[in-house]
Amino acid sequence: MITSSTERSASYLEKTAVVQNEHNGDLEISSPGGGPGTANMNPPESVGFSRGQQSLDHSVWYNGALMTFLATGEDTHGQFALIEAVGRRGSDAPPHIHHREDEIFYVLEGEIVFSVNDRTIKGTPGTMVFLPRDVRHSFTIESEQYRMLILVTPSGFEAWFREFGVPAPAMTLPPANEPAYGEVQRMLEAAPRYGLEFVLPQNP
């Protein structure tokens, strides 16, 4: 798992400190002026939503995967977006860099190999990978199918999947013969709007 400095962690959580208990691995959350187990929950409306089972209203087909938005920036006042991705072999992500948001990937099913700068991480069920912004990364699906959660903070990048995906007609995977990326040139042109940088192969 990739960790960041204390300073970056503080900025990620808007001055909420996250402390890893060295004795039992428990995660304690504290905020300025509060003890362990408390956190700054302002504005209070930001915790006042819930979402039930998966719905077509919140799902798209993107790059051979079914992407379901469990929470979006509209739900969380821009603090984070949570997405469930279900796909098959070939739903890979090319090398790229996010300049605006941090990502957390949590593998639920299947095997996914993450490349983070020059490091390789094998993700199996239960693996969590934290990717801070400005870090080059990609991933390759090694199993026939996979399922994972993607947390993006702050929110906003979920709009990319809506722009380049299509509304899912059913809670199923896209057809296996559907092209992975059908609008590559338009993606390259749109990337700067999302603070996204694709790392293209260098010419020999």
Locations of regions flagged by a protein language model:
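Short acidic (Asp/Glu) patches
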Residues: G64-M67, G90-S91, P132-V135
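A short, N-terminal "cap"/entry segment at the start of jelly-roll beta-barrel domains
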Residues: I2-T3, R8-F80, L173-P204
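Structural motif
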Residues: L66, I104, E111-V113, T120, ...
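A short hydrophobic beta-strand segment most commonly corresponding to one strand
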Residues: L82, F130-L131, S143-W160
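Short histidine-centered beta-strand/loop micro-motifs
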Residues: A71-T72, D92-H99, T140-E142
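Short, conserved beta-strand element in jelly-roll/cupin
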Residues: L82-R89, I97-V116, L151-P154
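A hydrophobic, small-residue-rich beta->alpha segment in the mid-to-C-terminal subdomain
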Residues: R147, A159-P174
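Short acidic-glycine-tyrosine-enriched beta hairpin
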Residues: D118-R136
